[in-house]
UniProtKB/Swiss-Prot annotation:
Taxonomy, superkingdom: Archaea
Protein name, UniProt field: Glutamate--tRNA ligase
Compartments, as annotated in UniProt: Cytoplasm
Coiled-coil ranges from the UniProt annotation: none
Family membership: Belongs to the class-I aminoacyl-tRNA synthetase family. Glutamate--tRNA ligase type 2 subfamily.
UniProt motif 'HIGH' region: location: 107-117
EC numbers, comma separated: 6.1.1.17
Length: 569
């Protein structure tokens, strides 16, 4: 192979490893080289072997050695990259006036917030910022059967964690008297009527595009039935329907429900009301009276635009501009309460903060930064194309935020004992980060160490290995335990470099490794791996929730004194 290509591969491998905690992967470098040298796409087999050898060689180097080689051979790879101003994907708004744009985020408090809620909140928030406008948080709390204060609180906590700020906070239920007033106005104008048909008859008539007898009643009869809805009719016996078009191709327009009876106690207003607006009626009225100029929601609501406009036209009220975007989901990570709730009830998932889920609580617990979520969502832009993203797309953004501030610690899994003779000291000082000044830590050592079982399998008798931050060790015996002798000032090139933990002060923790929850439509029984591992006593000094990188393993978040959660490589 051309020496120039080998040179380029090594530079890419060193740079990528250096930027990602000292490790890189064959497939990453293969992708990079094929991107810069497309002529090699017909020679993938030929170059793959060379890439594997170079990657293996680079991964054996410590971060300090990687940096040194780049400084000597590839200084351009360490040079600061010219910052390119990126436009983050939000197109300009139609009919937008600087300082006059009003957007809103109207979550229903019927579940824990997830990545889809984050997308809606961030898009609406960013548009308000873009135009120096106003952003409203409006809890869409008009279904007492499904809504709870715990969900209301969880949404506010999640939005606060995301760093989203609002100019106004309200609840849709604040305006119940307005909905009653507008409902009566529609009835009196003949644009709405009270329907007492059975639910199954209503559904059949809508399918067959036929009007029912209730739609023929006069205003007087409808007003009497409205009064009966206050205290006589039971839930399901009467509803207020909008007089749309029963022949319409858009089924949403076939005389939809505006108001219905729900005899459940509301979590804030109690039992003051029993007639509650439908989503379409509530959002139409609220957006108009709140002064919303641009209303964005996910595209499954797109067919409802016609209805919302029709309701506001019937009432002579101002209409906002309406925009739509695709739902955001991750492959194999459901956001639907219909799927998540049974998993919790069956014990397959622990709670809504289970790190395998895409809820905001779960993402926070897993170690995903809110800044990464925002950057990721903004990178998607305002598209209506389906967004079923792989989770590693978010991981790539998160890595940029956690790397600089994540303390490096040693951790070993499947621990194997190693006894070392002739050590020169009882304390070793190790930097907390290979590049950034995060200080140093002192590790007390004796002759007894733990190393990872995976590493021990690659060690041969009479070979020399390097314990990172400590020095070279010549292995003199291999068995249930390994033995070796410390070599002062040994050459570190082309030898295995591994992390370690002193047996005397080793702290045992449980490592939780979340994996994809569903393969296609099937629950993955192996979606959560648990490992018993040893780490340094320094782990106990970390704050709960602190992000760290276990050397040669990956980024993790401290969940408790005795447990860590794997974030990503």
């Amino acid at each position: 192979m051309d020496e120039e290509i080998k040179h380029e591969i090594r530079k890419m491998a060193l740079q990528n490893a250096f930027e990602h905690g000292g490790q890189t992967q064959d497939k990453i470098i293969l992708g990079k080289i094929l991107g810069t040298k497309p002529e090699f796409r017909t020679k993938v087999k030929e170059i793959s072997g060379e890439i594997s050898e170079i990657v293996a060689s680079v991964n054996q180097l410590s971060p300090e050695e990687q940096q040194k080689e780049m400084e000597e051979k590839f200084p351009e790879a360490l040079a600061p990259k010219e910052k390119i101003e990126e436009r983050e994907g939000l197109p300009e708004l139609k009919d937008a006036i600087q300082g006059k744009v009003v957007t809103r985020f109207p979550p229903e408090p019927n579940g824990y917030p997830h990545i889809g809620h984050a997308k809606a909140a961030i898009i609406n928030s960013e548009y308000a910022k873009m135009y120096g406008g106003k952003f409203i948080l409006r809890m869409d709390d008009t279904n007492p059967e499904a809504e709870r204060m715990e969900y209301h609180a969880a949404i506010k906590v999640g939005l606060e964690w995301l760093g989203i700020e609002f100019d106004q906070v309200k609840s849709t239920s604040d305006d119940m008297e307005v909905f009653y007033e507008k409902g009566i106005e529609l009835i009196n104008s003949g644009k709405a009527y009270v329907c007492t048909c059975k639910r199954e008859d209503i559904s059949q008539n809508r399918r067959e595009r036929k009007a029912c007898k209730c739609s023929m009643e006069d205003v007087g009869k409808n007003n009497k039935n409205w009064e009966k809805m206050q205290n006589k009719f039971k839930p399901g016996e009467a509803i207020v329907r909008f007089r749309g078009d029963m022949k319409a191709d858009n089924a949403v327009m076939r005389d939809p429900v505006l108001l219905r009876i729900i005899d459940e106690k509301h979590y804030t207003v109690g039992d003051k009301y029993r007639i509650w607006p439908s989503y379409d009626f509530a959002v139409a009225i609220e957006d108009s009276i709140d002064g919303v100029t641009h209303a964005f929601r996910s595209k499954e609501f797109e067919l409802r635009k016609e209805l919302i406009d029709a309701i506001l036209d019937a009432l002579g009220m101002r209409k906002p501009q309406q925009g739509f975007f695709s739902r955001l989901e991750f492959k194999g990570m459901p956001i639907s309460k219909r799927i998540i709730k049974p998993l919790i009830e069956e014990g397959k998932v622990s709670w809504y903060d289970d790190p395998r889920l895409p809820t905001l609580e779960a993402l926070r617990r897993r170690g995903i930064k809110p800044e990464a979520i925002r950057k990721f969502i903004m990178s998607l832009g305002l598209t209506k194309a389906n967004t079923l993203a792989p989770f590693d797309a978010l991981e790539a953004f998160n890595r940029k935020f956690v790397d600089a501030d994540s303390m490096r610690l040693f951790m070993v899994k499947n621990a194997k004992k190693l006894k070392i003779k002739n050590l020169q000291s009882t304390i070793v000082e190790v930097p907390n980060h290979p590049i950034n000044d995060l200080g140093k830590r002192k590790i007390e050592i004796t002759e007894d160490f733990y190393i990872s079982g995976d590493d021990s399998e690659a060690i041969k008798e009479q070979s020399t290995i390097r314990l990172l931050g400590l020095g070279n060790v010549k292995i003199t015996k291999i068995g249930n335990e390994l033995e070796g002798e410390f070599e002062r000032d040994g050459d570190s090139s082309n030898i295995l470099k591994i992390q370690w933990v002193p047996q005397k002060t080793a702290h045992e923790i449980k490592m939780i490794i979340p994996k994809i929850l569903f393969n296609d439509e099937e629950f993955n029984e192996d979606s959560l791996e648990e490992l018993d591992v040893y780490t340094e006593p320094q782990y106990l000094q970390l704050k709960e929730g602190e992000e760290i990188q276990f050397v040669r393993f990956g980024y993790c978040r401290k969940d408790s004194q005795n447990q860590a959660i794997f974030t990503h490589k």
